[in-house]
Amino acid sequence: MKSILELSEVKAYRYFMESSNYCSLDLPKYIDFSKVLTYVEGKVGKKSLDEILKDKGKKPSEYEGVNHRLLIKKDAKFMYRPIDVANPYLYYLLVRQITTKGNWKEIKRVFLTFVSPNIDVISILKVKGEKEKSHKSAGITDWWENVEQKTCILSLKYRYMFVTDITNCYGS
Protein backbone atom coordinates (compact mmCIF):
# COMPACT_ATOMS: atom_id res chain seq x y z
CA MET A 1 0.00 0.00 0.00
CA LYS A 2 1.38 3.38 -1.01
CA SER A 3 2.05 6.07 1.60
CA ILE A 4 1.72 9.78 0.96
CA LEU A 5 5.51 10.05 1.05
CA GLU A 6 5.67 8.08 -2.20
CA LEU A 7 3.68 10.76 -4.05
CA SER A 8 5.14 13.54 -6.15
CA GLU A 9 4.59 17.10 -4.94
CA VAL A 10 1.78 17.53 -7.50
CA LYS A 11 -0.04 14.38 -6.39
CA ALA A 12 0.51 15.26 -2.72
CA TYR A 13 -1.05 18.66 -3.39
CA ARG A 14 -4.09 17.00 -4.99
CA TYR A 15 -4.29 14.54 -2.09
CA PHE A 16 -4.39 17.28 0.54
CA MET A 17 -6.89 19.33 -1.46
CA GLU A 18 -9.45 16.52 -1.49
CA SER A 19 -12.45 17.28 0.71
CA SER A 20 -12.05 14.01 2.65
CA ASN A 21 -8.47 14.93 3.57
CA TYR A 22 -9.27 18.52 4.49
CA CYS A 23 -11.71 17.23 7.09
CA SER A 24 -11.56 13.54 7.93
CA LEU A 25 -14.55 13.56 10.29
CA ASP A 26 -17.42 11.23 9.46
CA LEU A 27 -19.85 13.92 8.36
CA PRO A 28 -23.08 13.45 6.39
CA LYS A 29 -22.48 13.00 2.64
CA TYR A 30 -24.12 16.35 1.85
CA ILE A 31 -21.31 18.16 3.70
CA ASP A 32 -18.57 18.36 1.09
CA PHE A 33 -15.74 20.87 1.26
CA SER A 34 -14.66 20.48 -2.39
CA LYS A 35 -16.40 23.66 -3.54
CA VAL A 36 -14.97 25.63 -0.63
CA LEU A 37 -11.43 24.43 -1.35
CA THR A 38 -11.82 25.08 -5.09
CA TYR A 39 -13.16 28.57 -4.36
CA VAL A 40 -10.26 29.38 -2.02
CA GLU A 41 -7.73 27.98 -4.49
CA GLY A 42 -9.15 30.19 -7.25
CA LYS A 43 -9.50 33.26 -5.05
CA VAL A 44 -6.01 33.08 -3.51
CA GLY A 45 -4.08 31.53 -6.40
CA LYS A 46 -0.39 32.39 -6.00
CA LYS A 47 -0.94 35.32 -3.61
CA SER A 48 0.98 35.33 -0.35
CA LEU A 49 -0.61 35.46 3.10
CA ASP A 50 0.31 39.15 3.41
CA GLU A 51 -1.49 39.92 0.16
CA ILE A 52 -4.79 38.39 1.27
CA LEU A 53 -4.91 39.71 4.85
CA LYS A 54 -7.64 42.24 5.52
CA ASP A 55 -5.60 43.87 8.30
CA LYS A 56 -2.00 43.79 7.07
CA GLY A 57 -0.65 44.49 10.55
CA LYS A 58 -2.11 41.37 12.18
CA LYS A 59 -1.36 37.72 11.50
CA PRO A 60 -4.07 35.02 11.84
CA SER A 61 -2.30 33.67 14.94
CA GLU A 62 -3.17 36.90 16.73
CA TYR A 63 -6.91 36.23 16.43
CA GLU A 64 -9.11 33.89 18.43
CA GLY A 65 -11.37 31.54 16.51
CA VAL A 66 -9.58 31.72 13.17
CA ASN A 67 -10.50 28.04 12.68
CA HIS A 68 -13.97 26.53 13.02
CA ARG A 69 -14.62 24.60 16.24
CA LEU A 70 -17.04 21.68 16.27
CA LEU A 71 -18.08 19.59 19.25
CA ILE A 72 -18.25 15.88 18.52
CA LYS A 73 -20.06 13.51 20.87
CA LYS A 74 -17.48 11.13 22.32
CA ASP A 75 -19.74 8.45 23.79
CA ALA A 76 -23.27 7.89 25.06
CA LYS A 77 -22.59 10.05 28.10
CA PHE A 78 -22.23 13.82 28.13
CA MET A 79 -18.67 13.95 26.87
CA TYR A 80 -17.88 16.07 23.85
CA ARG A 81 -14.60 16.37 22.01
CA PRO A 82 -13.67 19.77 20.55
CA ILE A 83 -12.45 19.45 16.98
CA ASP A 84 -11.08 22.37 15.00
CA VAL A 85 -11.63 22.41 11.26
CA ALA A 86 -8.83 24.45 9.73
CA ASN A 87 -9.62 27.78 8.15
CA PRO A 88 -9.78 26.88 4.43
CA TYR A 89 -7.66 29.89 3.42
CA LEU A 90 -4.90 29.00 5.87
CA TYR A 91 -5.19 25.33 4.96
CA TYR A 92 -4.75 26.11 1.27
CA LEU A 93 -1.72 28.31 1.96
CA LEU A 94 -0.16 25.55 4.07
CA VAL A 95 -0.82 22.83 1.48
CA ARG A 96 0.54 25.04 -1.28
CA GLN A 97 3.67 25.77 0.79
CA ILE A 98 4.51 22.22 1.85
CA THR A 99 3.92 20.80 -1.63
CA THR A 100 6.31 23.06 -3.51
CA LYS A 101 8.94 20.92 -5.21
CA GLY A 102 11.73 21.86 -2.79
CA ASN A 103 9.68 21.64 0.40
CA TRP A 104 8.08 18.31 -0.51
CA LYS A 105 11.51 16.88 -1.36
CA GLU A 106 12.82 18.07 2.03
CA ILE A 107 9.84 16.59 3.92
CA LYS A 108 10.43 13.23 2.24
CA ARG A 109 14.17 13.43 2.98
CA VAL A 110 13.57 14.16 6.68
CA PHE A 111 11.14 11.26 7.00
CA LEU A 112 13.79 8.97 5.55
CA THR A 113 16.10 9.91 8.44
CA PHE A 114 13.49 8.52 10.86
CA VAL A 115 13.63 5.02 9.36
CA SER A 116 14.75 2.35 11.79
CA PRO A 117 14.96 -1.39 11.04
CA ASN A 118 13.19 -2.40 14.25
CA ILE A 119 10.37 0.17 14.20
CA ASP A 120 7.40 0.08 11.85
CA VAL A 121 5.69 3.44 11.38
CA ILE A 122 2.07 2.70 10.57
CA SER A 123 0.68 6.20 11.13
CA ILE A 124 1.92 7.77 7.88
CA LEU A 125 -1.06 8.61 5.69
CA LYS A 126 -1.97 6.00 3.10
CA VAL A 127 -3.21 6.57 -0.44
CA LYS A 128 -6.14 4.59 -1.73
CA GLY A 129 -5.37 1.97 -4.34
CA GLU A 130 -7.68 0.18 -6.74
CA LYS A 131 -9.18 -1.98 -3.96
CA GLU A 132 -10.00 0.81 -1.48
CA LYS A 133 -12.91 3.23 -1.80
CA SER A 134 -11.19 6.02 0.12
CA HIS A 135 -7.89 7.07 1.66
CA LYS A 136 -9.45 6.43 5.05
CA SER A 137 -10.29 2.83 4.14
CA ALA A 138 -6.71 2.41 2.86
CA GLY A 139 -5.45 3.53 6.27
CA ILE A 140 -7.82 1.14 8.05
CA THR A 141 -6.75 -1.75 5.83
CA ASP A 142 -3.10 -0.92 6.46
CA TRP A 143 -3.75 -0.79 10.21
CA TRP A 144 -5.50 -4.17 10.07
CA GLU A 145 -2.65 -5.78 8.14
CA ASN A 146 0.32 -4.16 9.89
CA VAL A 147 -0.92 -3.88 13.46
CA GLU A 148 -3.78 -6.29 14.12
CA GLN A 149 -2.51 -9.18 12.01
CA LYS A 150 1.14 -8.59 12.87
CA THR A 151 0.24 -8.61 16.58
CA CYS A 152 -1.23 -12.09 16.17
CA ILE A 153 1.88 -13.31 14.35
CA LEU A 154 4.24 -11.78 16.93
CA SER A 155 2.20 -13.23 19.80
CA LEU A 156 3.39 -16.66 18.68
CA LYS A 157 7.00 -15.50 18.93
CA TYR A 158 6.93 -13.44 22.14
CA ARG A 159 5.61 -14.26 25.58
CA TYR A 160 4.71 -10.72 26.70
CA MET A 161 3.27 -7.66 25.03
CA PHE A 162 3.13 -4.07 26.25
CA VAL A 163 -0.01 -2.19 25.23
CA THR A 164 -0.83 1.46 25.78
CA ASP A 165 -3.84 3.54 24.79
CA ILE A 166 -5.12 7.03 25.41
CA THR A 167 -8.68 6.59 26.60
CA ASN A 168 -9.72 10.19 27.18
CA CYS A 169 -7.23 12.79 26.06
CA TYR A 170 -9.93 15.50 26.04
CA GLY A 171 -11.09 15.20 29.66
CA SER A 172 -12.21 18.39 31.35
Report each predicted region and the residues it spans.
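Conserved two-metal-ion catalytic palm core of "right-hand" nucleic acid polymerases
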Residues: 1-172
